């Protein structure tokens, strides 16, 4: 099962989160679930086409009632922003025309592109387009990923490799890539190289390590804390958690989309219960 299915969808809700974050149960035209799905697909196609040279890793879309938030994770943020933000403004205006809503565009830089599967696949495809031998391109990508800290990498090329008349597939692997293990952090990327002989498909799997039980519990707790409680506020404390008792968990303060800072709950914040005479 793990060998065939998409690694991202296989681990969705376990080690991976959704890349389209919204909910719709409306029957109104333009606000239905299928309308939003088609709109998300159109947004991603436009972004990948206009920012093909920017090295876009992933696009995350969030929706509210009258606003669409688009987060772009790229290895070359300067190309996306442009001179004095002209390119970013052009992309935002194009998305507003497509969606008919106000668009908030956020650009994030990928710190280590050598272990980002989508960027590695794009890099191999660019080399194949420039007529670099496929074995050299695969070997260089493997060496760069392992040197950058990956625990394993697997690359598959399919098509008319080297201009051969009959298409074939070739695998290259280094290290461990446990596709069946759910707690394994597997990054997956796919890209097509357009060569003079036709298209060559590039698939990349990168193994970055296992998610520990503590990290999994922290992720689940964070997802639970992000859900709004009653009247838009936080949920009431449990019956056993009275005033004066220190909670067992930790408050997580978000400092960015890819970073988290944990703050311990101080004992001085506890309030002693009042006694009636």
From Swiss-Prot:
KH type-2 domain boundaries: 43-111
One of the record's GO cellular component terms: cytosolic small ribosomal subunit
Gene Ontology biological-process annotations: translation
Keywords of this entry: Ribonucleoprotein, Ribosomal protein, RNA-binding, rRNA-binding
Stored InterPro entries: KH_dom (IPR004087), KH_dom-like_a/b (IPR015946), KH_dom_type_2 (IPR004044), KH_sf_prok-type (IPR009019), Ribosomal_S3_C_sf (IPR036419), Ribosomal_uS3_bac-typ (IPR005704), Ribosomal_uS3_C (IPR001351), Ribosomal_uS3_CS (IPR018280)
Gene3D superfamilies membership: 3.30.300.20, Ribosomal protein S3, C-terminal domain (3.30.1140.32)
Biased composition range(s): Basic and acidic residues: 264-277
Ranges where the record places region Disordered: 216-277
GO terms assigned for molecular function: mRNA binding; rRNA binding; structural constituent of ribosome
Database matches in Pfam families: KH_2, Ribosomal_S3_C
Family: Belongs to the universal ribosomal protein uS3 family.
Role played: Binds the lower part of the 30S subunit head. Binds mRNA in the 70S ribosome, positioning it for translation.
Assembly and binders: Part of the 30S ribosomal subunit. Forms a tight complex with proteins S10 and S14.
Identification of the protein by name: Small ribosomal subunit protein uS3
Species annotation: Bifidobacterium animalis subsp. lactis (strain AD011)
Gene: rpsC
């Amino acid at each position: 099962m793990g060998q065939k299915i998409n690694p991202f969808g296989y681990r969705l809700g376990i080690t991976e989160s959704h890349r389209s974050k919204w909910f719709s149960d409306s029957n109104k035209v333009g606000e239905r679930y299928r309308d939003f799905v088609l709109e998300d697909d159109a947004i991603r196609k436009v972004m990948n086409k206009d920012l093909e040279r920017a090295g876009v890793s992933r696009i995350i879309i969030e929706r509210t009632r009258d606003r669409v938030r688009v987060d772009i994770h790229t290895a070359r943020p300067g190309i996306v922003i442009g001179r004095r933000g002209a390119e970013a403004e052009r992309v935002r205006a194009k998305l507003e025309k497509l969606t008919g809503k106000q668009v908030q565009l956020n650009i994030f830089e990928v710190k280590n592109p050598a272990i980002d599967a989508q960027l590695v696949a794009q890099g191999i495809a660019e080399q194949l387009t420039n007529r670099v031998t496929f074995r050299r391109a695969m070997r260089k990508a493997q060496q760069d990923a392992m040197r950058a800290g990956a625990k394993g990498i697997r690359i598959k090329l399919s098509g008319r490799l080297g201009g051969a008349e009959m298409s074939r597939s070739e695998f290259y692997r280094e290290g461990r890539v446990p596709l069946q293990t759910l707690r394994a952090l597997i990054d997956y990327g796919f890209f097509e190289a357009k060569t003079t002989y036709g298209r060559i498909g590039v698939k990349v799997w990168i193994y970055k390590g296992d998610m520990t039980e503590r990290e999994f519990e922290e992720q689940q707790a964070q997802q639970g804390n992000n859900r709004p409680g009653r009247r838009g506020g936080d949920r009431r404390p449990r019956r056993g958690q009275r005033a004066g008792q220190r909670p067992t968990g930790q408050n997580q303060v978000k400092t960015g989309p890819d970073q988290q800072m944990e703050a311990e709950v101080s004992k001085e914040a506890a309030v002693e219960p009042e006694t009636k005479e």
